[in-house]
């Protein structure tokens, strides 16, 4: 049988997609011996007066009581204001970082912009959720306030504007639900796969599994880094409030 004939037969059978499907199909459809997923209490959504309840398997980063799971870059205790079920940026005290590092994750953050609103453009309720201390999802008062599109609320800062502006008025609690897959590097530091992020702002999809081009604070290319790094919240000199922050670590998809 000639090589050309073999290729024709191979393509007729679906080519690589057929082979790939056979390799990946470890379990038969409806196989009752297939391991069942663990049951997890999904928690409950919040209201304007009450924070939501995290899922049972979440790592709670702020439970409404203290900031013990956060620190400044030098390791000192977080100096942001801790109030009744929320905490607030204290301008000029510096960004805060989780004491625990994270990689692939499902992240939930609730925030509220200052009231009354002050300033315009980037000087209006500015903060940021900086994943791994490198990849920022912008926090900003974008309700009836204009700025450059890749710098408004829900943007991957400096790279992707949000698909829509889903902002609520200042003072109302808002949510980010973020699915993040960290970049992968080989042992020599070569980039194997860039980071990807999906963001829902107040339940509305604003970033759809976009490929992050590198650190968002600069236009620099990727540099190799650890598989897990702390989550960072930004002090941009505005008293933005946060509550009900939790993470579910995701299994390595490689």
PLM ranges: what are they?
Residues 4-15:
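Bacterial N-terminal signal peptides
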Residues 18-254:
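Carbohydrate-interacting regions of secretory-pathway proteins
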